[in-house]
From Swiss-Prot:
Cited function: Essential for respiratory growth and required for mitochondrial protein synthesis. Required for vacuolar acidification.
Family label: Belongs to the RRG1 family.
Name of this chain's protein: Required for respiratory growth protein 1, mitochondrial
Source organism of this protein record: Saccharomyces cerevisiae (strain ATCC 204508 / S288c)
Record PTM: N-glycosylated. Glycosylation is important for correct localization of the protein.
GO biological process: mitochondrial genome maintenance; mitochondrial tRNA 5'-end processing; vacuolar acidification
UniProt miscellaneous comment: Present with 1670 molecules/cell in log phase SD medium.
UniProt GO cellular component terms: matrix side of mitochondrial inner membrane; mitochondrion
Localization per Swiss-Prot or TrEMBL: Mitochondrion
Record keywords: Glycoprotein, Mitochondrion
Domain of life: Eukaryota
Length: 365
């Protein structure tokens, strides 16, 4: 059984010795830090990549190139090193879209930059793979047959599935608008969610508001955390100064002292001030700032609760979008019935303009 060269002691010793020699020679013979980094990075990648090579010829070739690299370094032939490294550099992985475009070029005279053609090829590729997995199509299919015979069948199957989903949605009845919210800190930002304003149709102002509230809430939390840290240090200073004056160590429950209560009368929102003068001098300024931050946070909560009640529910946006959603459903239902009666019975797969995808596009589906 073939064995990895990395497990042969003599080979391992030779490679490590050569690698150390090259690493020592790189800064001596090359004065460009960028080029030094490039050489080291390429060597590291190649050593890791071929660590488990079992091909003797591959290992022999790479060791020769490794030795040649060391000789070029000693002789100062930097251009030859660049030429030697070019084929060793890792190629960038092709994007899936690029592969599709390359495949489209081989299909014939098509507009490879057209997104619609790319989408059609996606559908065709998925159709062929699915049928081949089921044993209904051979492994090799000529490009002409793919383009002229299988593409209409694939598009028709895809359109049939789309038609089924449209029918099911219409069968479920008119969609209704509803209230939804996103939580940012203590705030619940309410907005209307409906088929009319989903995705890109959603209000840009709403997105700006949510991002602003997220930023402000996080800033408020960070400020409170910073104040808590400062309050702890301030309490230590107060305890120390009190001890210097009265030789007594005071005890204060700091979390309770900094506690802020909402939804109660303003005069009792916070605990009374400490009886110790030093605590008042050191901790109370930080405490006041924390109470202001808490107060600001609860004010925003009240604002969004009122916004939900006044602007959304009582004949506002919710009623408007609910009405528009029902109008859209009625229009789509009328178009679907018209399409089912006038056009669907006469669909023909292989005639452009009368195939199912064209019919759905014509009626806005």
């Amino acid at each position: 059984m073939a064995q990895n060269f990395g497990k042969i002691p003599s080979h391992k010793s030779y490679v490590l010795s050569l690698y150390r020699t090259v690493l020592r020679n790189i800064p001596k013979c090359c004065h460009s830090y960028a080029f030094q980094y490039e050489i080291k990075k390429t060597l590291s990648i190649q050593l890791f990549k071929h660590k488990h090579d079992k091909s003797s010829w591959s290992v022999y070739t790479l060791l020769n190139e490794f030795s040649l690299l060391n000789n070029c370094l000693l002789e100062g032939k930097l251009q030859e090193i660049k030429n030697l490294m070019k084929p060793l550099k890792k190629m960038k992985k092709q994007l899936k879209t690029t592969k599709i475009l390359n495949s489209l070029t081989s299909l014939g005279d098509v507009k490879t930059n057209d997104p619609e053609e790319v989408r059609r090829f996606h559908v065709l590729s998925a159709y062929i793979k699915r049928k081949q997995d089921l044993g209904l199509l051979p492994a090799y299919i000529p490009k002409t047959y793919q383009h002229k015979l299988l593409l209409p069948l694939a598009l028709n199957e895809h359109a049939c599935l789309k038609l089924f989903h449209i029918q099911q949605k219409l069968k479920n009845g008119p969609p209704s608008a509803g209230l939804s919210y996103t939580k940012e800190g203590r705030n619940q930002i309410w907005f209307v969610r409906s088929p009319i304003n989903k995705g890109r149709q959603q209000s840009k102002k709403l997105g700006i508001l949510i991002r602003k509230e997220r930023k402000d809430s996080q800033k408020n939390i960070d400020n409170l955390n910073f104040c808590e840290i400062n309050a702890a240090w301030a309490l230590h200073e107060a305890i120390w100064e009190e001890y210097l004056e009265s030789k007594k160590i005071i005890k204060v429950n700091l979390p309770k002292y900094l506690e802020y209560a909402a939804n109660i009368p303003k005069s009792t929102k916070c605990n009374p001030s400490s009886q110790y003068q030093k605590v008042k001098e050191w901790v109370d300024p930080v405490r006041e700032i924390m109470f202001e931050l808490h107060s600001k946070s609860f004010q925003r909560v009240e604002y969004f609760n009122k916004y939900k009640e006044k602007l959304l529910k009582n004949g506002g946006q919710l009623a408007y979008f609910d009405k528009k959603s029902k109008e859209m459903y009625a229009k789509r239902l009328t178009l679907f019935r018209k399409m089912s009666k006038e056009t669907l019975p006469y669909v023909t797969l292989f005639i452009e303009g009368r195939d199912l995808p064209s019919v759905l596009a014509k009626y806005g589906f």
